[in-house]
């Protein structure tokens, strides 16, 4: 796994999640259901922090209750607890980090700033997307310092920023000290992600295509400079080709829809893809979870599970979540419209995150499960938008 050309050398950012699951294995053995129950705990904490974020943004119990209802009603996030990857743990650390950032405007600013950085740093270790949140946070801290001239706060920002910048080198030296043959600087994933993010793949526009990394290692061996040059050249060629063929708008329409107009945000895909990547044999233990029963002999799910995953029950869930998705986006839009003239830093932070990530993923390799974070962060905004819209409707009827 750790040797050159293998998983970790290609994806060094996955080291923390590998170590995380090693830790779970040490505690629980290879009991995958125990891992999924850990995800359930994280899920409850995600709900908790989304509600806390809502209470900071609005300080209205009705809006907090609406946020809780939105959390519970999004079935696909509950499905994600079966997906043993970094998604659910990272969502927890991200929501906690955002809460402590917003809370530093109200009480114990230094303590909450430090907690926010710690939680978001943990989130970045598990999911690199959280770096965007850290950058947004640092920008707002700098703007705050310009207004307040608070030396203690800016010192925390400076120290944290330096640590974030140096963290890749720290990780590289730590891993290299364990095995001198490993050098994480040889990773070319940035270039690979840009190539895939600007080209069509078998799964979707801008998605991970599965062929480019093996091609690079076969073509260039250990010559990482040549790999990087190939990646940059292909990215430029991809964009030029899309423009020349008048397919740029079509490409980004497909990519954006697959990321943001995806009702279950790949919730069901993540737990079924392993079973039937090419409609072939799968590993039943990789997606079993209590009531999901699997017929090992015939390689089929039970009738209920099959209906839940791909049948009529699934169709009803997707239909319902499609309606929910429209409510979420419309509610968030109402929030922006109703608060446009009284936007404080607290109220603008989550929209700023959404916009920043949207722009980042225009070029970067992406798919629906990457954007689920930004989707659930809209819940507190949607709750306030719905409540404000209801007030307007009631007042107009009087």
Region locations from a protein language model:
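Extracytoplasmic catalytic/substrate-binding loops of multi-pass membrane glycan-assembly enzymes
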Residues: 1-20, 29-33, 184, 227-228
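Membrane-proximal stem/loop segments at transmembrane-domain junctions that anchor or position
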Residues: 2-3, 177-294
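Membrane-interface anchor segments at the N-terminal boundary of transmembrane helices
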Residues: 34, 38-39, 254-354
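Transmembrane-helix motifs of polytopic, lipid-linked glycan transferases
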Residues: 37-58, 96, 331-334
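Transmembrane-helix signature of polytopic, membrane-embedded enzymes
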Residues: 50-73, 345-348
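Short acidic/glycine- and proline-prone juxtamembrane loop motifs at membrane-interface regions
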Residues: 79-90
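Membrane-interface transmembrane helices that cradle and orient dolichyl/undecaprenyl
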Residues: 95-113
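Membrane-interface alpha helices of multi-pass inner-membrane proteins
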Residues: 112-127, 161-167, 359
